[in-house]
Amino acid sequence: ALTNYRRRHLGYVFQMYNLIPNLNVKENIEVGAYLSDKSLDIDELLKTLGLYEHRHKLPNQLSGGQQQRTAIGRAIVKNPDILLCDEPTGALDYNTSKEILKLIEDVNQKYGNTVIMVTHNDAIKNMADRVIKLRDGQIRKDYTNEVKIPAQELDW
């Protein structure tokens, strides 16, 4: 039952992209589509991700940001209710990090899924509806942002 729930309702974006090296961008995203009966149109998603022109490239032919966008695509193609992001910008430079955060924000607005993001970057909390801060496995703060800052306006 738990496996079926995860398969149908959850999408995961990892810090390390976990792309399949011998599959191209489109095929890596299609892997996620096979897990759902409510998957999104892959070509439309590739365009949303800014990857349509790169769809036939292998992961080793992509920049870090393109690889992360591919990983995000694989997670959201199955149209999950909840998207879990573990340090989605951890291995990326400042500008690429902001692009990825903007993409996650856009995907959230376009598809209406809940995004749960784990990050050590304190500035990212400003784009969230709700912030839960943990330390040593304990909740230290739990609050709602009255005014969210769009991803493109974040600075760190």
Spans of features found by a protein language model:
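Hydrophobic anchor residue at the start of the ABC signature
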Residues: 72
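Conserved catalytic motifs of ABC-family nucleotide-binding domains
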Residues: 79
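Short coil-to-helix segment of the ABC ATPase nucleotide-binding domain corresponding to the Q-loop/switch region
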Residues: 23-30
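Conserved ABC ATPase "signature" region
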Residues: 38-53
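Catalytic Walker B motif of ABC-type/P-loop ATPase nucleotide-binding domains
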Residues: 83-86
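ABC ATPase NBD coupling module
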Residues: 1-11, 149-153
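Conserved ABC ATPase signature
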Residues: 4, 58-68
